[in-house]
């Protein structure tokens, strides 16, 4: 296998480039591969560590794909033969293509897209492997580009419409995730949110606070 650094784009079928090592055969090749992430194809929109894997979510050309490293080897994305600890690469296939906005490691690997909120179910008897992975849609509000925040036992996120802040929380009763609005009583405090952050409790402070920063510089506290 040879790697080529592209120097110039000439046409849809022709480029110039530099080999990392001299090729043994200079005949024309009809089979080749490109890097998943690059300045041409875009880079991952979100990243997280989950179950000893480095997880990348979405890119410009692959907006609904998940890439997970080999267990314990964060820079190894070789899918190999599909062994339990090898890299996992999947597409979230639904009725409509949605962009992954964020991936978060919480109780499960949670995925926030432009159209829905999903999670990857796992358990002690069902670990995360290439052969067992599945993605389950839970709610359908869609997420904005603001990163979700771990707050008070839930993942708090801003909806796609930017009209509500909701908490993605697991219900032991229904064995599913809910997305209840937590901004209903303070709707007038929500402007155009551009960032969120949580202040956790401390030895001298029992309360925890969620701060939302608006585009005009104002800040709301929940």
Where are these predicted regions, by residue range?
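Short solvent-exposed strand/turn elements
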Residues: 12-31
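Ser/Thr/Gly-rich low-complexity blocks that favor extended beta-strand/coil architectures
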Residues: 1-13
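Short coil-to-beta transition motif at edge beta-strands of beta-rich domains
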Residues: 1, 205-210
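RNase H-like, metal-dependent nuclease domains and their acidic two-metal-ion catalytic environment used
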Residues: 213
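Beta-propeller and closely related beta-pinwheel folds
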Residues: 26-206, 222
